Amino acid sequence: MWWPIGPYGTIMAFILASTIPLRNLLTRDEPEERLRLSDLPQEIRSKGYKWHISLYLAMYLFKAVIDHHNEPLKSRVGGYTHWVHQLEGDFTLWAQEAFRNDLLTEALAFHYLFVYLFIIWFVPIYFILVKDHVMADKAALNYLVVYVLAVPLYLFFNVEVTSSFIPGMDALLYHDSWYIEFITNNDPLDNGIPSLHFGLPLGLLIINRLHCREMGIPLKEWRHRELDLFIIINLGIYLFSIQYLGIHWITDTIPGIILAFICAYFCHHWQPLLRDRPTKGWRSIMPSSRGIALAVAFSVACTSAIALVAIDGPGSEEDVANFRLGPGDLVIDTIEVHSLNHPVTVEIRNVGEFGSLCVILERTHVVSDFEKGRFSNGFDFNDLLEYPYHQVVPLISGESWRGEVETPSILDTSLVICHSSGGISELRISMEYVDDELIFTGILASLPAFIITGLVVDVASRSEGVEGEDSADVDA
């Protein structure tokens, strides 16, 4: 499918066009609470919303830094998809096969990208546009904190998408002509754990409940109850779509749930402290000595686990497959552009019993040849060999190939596309980049997650202690 502004531009246009109408729909019973657009600049200045804008810009840069680390670290970290597969098997394949329908695929693919970006953008904007600065703060913090918490798992516990590892499962979203360029530019396809498509909206739901409990308001009487229902409905859709589209394992949602709780407690506790900081000073947001001790303890313990277990650990064993494909299946791995002058060293090892054929070629040649996880009608793997290519790699069981691929342009990249004509092929595809020694900075980027976790443990334990004392007083 061709469209001049692509999926991201289309989705952002939808988001911008629907923001005010949806705000008006959700506040139809209280129009007096709406902020006039002409008053928005003054509201931004008076409520200090400039830091929200700065936060989103910082988040964009931080994500770019993490993405820059992801692939180079894999040569030392490897992946753990085989562990997840051993745990839950091929259950998600059933979800795809039982409900597969072209119209459903189109709807869920658009929903997967649209609603996630919509929740990131709309929820804090909605709270700003209905003059609720407390919830606007918490929603903006939720986006930043939940991603920060996910960084250690993204960098040091790689899990491939289900469609790359379950034979017979198609990448209904990722291997499609309209999405493939956007996806290969923005998603390494091995950040299965945790699922932030599940964790981010769940964090908002938990924040909503903590807020209502603090205010003494029943959730059903909260003025933003309809927004809460909107998020709940979309969370339910995500639970199905991430399996149906060949993206997430069910297991991926569990760390997402855990991070959502940690994130929600952090945002709920620190929002008023951050909001009052200009008047009370920096000392007002400093954690207790116990909180600092727990943050340091978590940082030391988790950093040690990364250094001693994750790096050159069980995920990096050369005989462990990170791609599995059945007869007629195809898998795609992206060769990222990290340097215009230094080639990427690519190694493909056949660690299974059946042979496989791989071709390495530039994405621009094949972007229109995929449709809903498969080749377009009338096109097959052999047609790829008609394009200019870097290398064709036929591999029988036990064979490996190692070579260099140039990345001369930031406007295009190369893809490793592999195919199995018979039997279940198991491959290990690894790449070495010029900046592959990023272990130290990767660990540094993970430290905020460990610090936040330690601080939340301190706050949560103190809250439980206070509630216990209150209950004892009531009983007495």
Whereabouts are the PLM-identified features?
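Terminal transmembrane helix and immediately flanking juxtamembrane interfaces
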Residues: 1-159, 170, 175-182, 212-244, ...
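Alpha-helix N-cap/helix-initiation motif
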Residues: 191, 247-248
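Extracellular acidic loop/turn motifs
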Residues: 193, 353-356
